UniProtKB/Swiss-Prot annotation:
Gene Ontology terms, MF aspect: protein serine/threonine phosphatase activity; protein tyrosine phosphatase activity
Top-level EC class: hydrolase
Pfam families in alphabetical order: DSPn, Tc-R-P
Name recorded for this polypeptide: Dual specificity protein phosphatase CDC14B
UniProt organism field: Mus musculus (Mouse)
Chain intervals for the UniProt region annotation (B): 213-379
Family, as annotated: Belongs to the protein-tyrosine phosphatase family. Non-receptor class CDC14 subfamily.
Amino acid sequence: MKRKSERRSAWATAPPCSRRSSSSSPGVKKSRSSTPQELHRLEQQDDLYLDITDRLCFAILYSRPKSATNEHYFSIDNELEYENFYADFGPLNLAMVYRYCCKINKKLKSITMLRKKIIHFTGTDQRKQANAAFLVGCYMVIYLGRTPEDAYRTLIFGDTAYIPFRDAAYGSCSFYITLLDCFHAVKKAMQYGFFNFNSFNLDEYEHYEKAENGDFNWIIPERFLAFCGPHSRSRLESGYHQHSPETYIPYFKNHNVTTIIRLNKRMYDAKRFTDAGFDHHDLFFPDGSTPAESIVQEFLDICENVKGAIAVHCKAGLGRTGTLIGCYLMKHYRMTAAESIAWLRICRPGSVIGPQQQFLVMKQSSLWLEGDYFRQKLRGQENGPLREAFSKHLSDADDLSLNGLENQDNQEPEPYSDDDEVSGMTQGDRLRALKSRRQPKASAIPLTCPLAVLTSALCSVAIWWIVCDYILPTLLFCLDGFRTQ
């Protein structure tokens, strides 16, 4: 193993994306079932440096770096942290992406760092490695104009690997989204105008995502808002915050929300929204399940004929809500199922759970064709060449179940009644309770506030002492001199 000074010298002269302390592989992943001997071997792995630009570098380090005159190291591992429900660990939300990008831009523009290499480093925790790489990749896509593939290739140089992201369900996971899925989602969201960091309202996002402040997020600004289900009255019950319809009405009216779609059992009277001037629709299906085809088509039909924004909720506003909004994203923006899930989770962590993920994968091709036909129809080409393929695909899809097996009864499921959702704790209840119990974490900015106040107070005292002990007596002496003349 080379010494730190030798490693820095070697890094400074090495070609881009290959700056390692030696030829061994630093990107080997730790398994959760690793033996102590394997862990000891992995701890001896060498550091990895990946050049992003001539001044920006991403590093995976197996020991904390020391400062240098020509390098500035920083880490966000303990600053921008994902708030998990169960075993989920990412991706980080849109506010954290914004904070990270602002941090990078500030460092690159800092006068005191103009001659320094900016090195974002992460440690040995695989989950934090994945989230750190996610942030770096997002910066490359958003600010450096890289394609998702280019950003991903930069990060997986050599044998470097990152664990994929999983859902917020309790227990095992059978579906994952990758960094590349996330980068594609961010790229398409940029292209379609889903976010713009030049006008992004960080305070609003971080305020309203909290359970106590309404627990809602925009998925598509001015079009789709996902929120947790309102109750008959506002209170703290069973460990989570409950909000009445009246809690949301002022914000909805100020942001042109015209339609409410409820996917869960009736916890409030819809008249409280309709009397306030909103349209309200009920499309019930069981918590944690996937919607029937009739539910999907009715949801899409409502959304395609609504003027203004649409607020969608189930119990927690995560599973059922994310699933149907995901269907809309696939039909009208031709996002893949994985990209739709990735974008939903970047906007609203925890969205789309369990079998709902495979459901979206199954629906992808048919919804793409529906979207193609929809756009063709709008252009006055109702009898165009896509019609035949579209009709054939729908007839084929009707013969398949979620698992790809033949549908034996060929019958549409009965419409779901809210009586089917029992009064006991369901998945949505548990997720809401977990979110409500989260303790607010101090970010890097609030942590500096006490220091700023203390510094300001000390400066004030020092100035007052200088004025009173030196300047003021001098002025009084001069004034006395003028009086004696």
